[in-house]
Amino acid sequence: MRKNAIVMGASSGMGREVALLLLADGWQVGVAARRADALEQLRKQYPEQVTVAVIDVTDETAGEQLTALAERMGGMDLYFHASGIGKQNPNVDAEIELLTVGTNGMGFTRMIDAAFGYMAKHGGGHIAAITSVAGTKGLGMAPSYSATKAFQNIYLQALEQLANMRKLNISFTDIRPGFVATALLDDEHHYPMLMNVQTTARLIMKAVKAKKHVAIVDWRYRVLIALWRRVPRCIWRHLPIKTKD
């Protein structure tokens, strides 16, 4: 039986690795991102399985472009959102903060809503998104990043409840990885418990196939987050949570 997936943010990093795993598993995959050259490389590698669409999540028409891609493919069983940005910003540069909100907040909402609307009209599907463990607590070194990741966590939870209220056959998987060695992390800092992108992608796909509601990747971060959640605000605000220089 033909299975169709669309991966938003498939040009690099986790999105590309997940797209490759889906392709190896026999899926028809719509790959979407801003970089046409990287997407074309995937199409050349898998000409019978890949459909390309150049989409920028910050474009006001990006939702309509996603719907058009789904229709061009003949359906969308899985929408996988791997598009996002993040920077440490201890000086609270407003340009960085607003750019992060535009991509991780507005762009995320635009694409998830489009996928939700499409699946609601076409009998259901599965929405999976890479968020982050950073959404667990406010991180002083990356204010807008941690705030937008918390927004993503709650937004997916709210849509999952809405889908059940409306009796829609839509599943959700909120994927919360820790630090992964991708271009999203700059080379100027040392990141603790850094994870390999290929290994992380395999763990993510395992969670997607199992249709887990929330997947913290990997076990070390599950332990860390369990501890973070127990730290009261009066103590948390004094903790110097940051990467090493």
PLM regions: where:
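Conserved glycine-rich cofactor-binding loop
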Residues: 11-12
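Short alpha-helical oligomerization interface
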Residues: 89-102
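Rossmann-fold cofactor-recognition segment
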Residues: 46-61
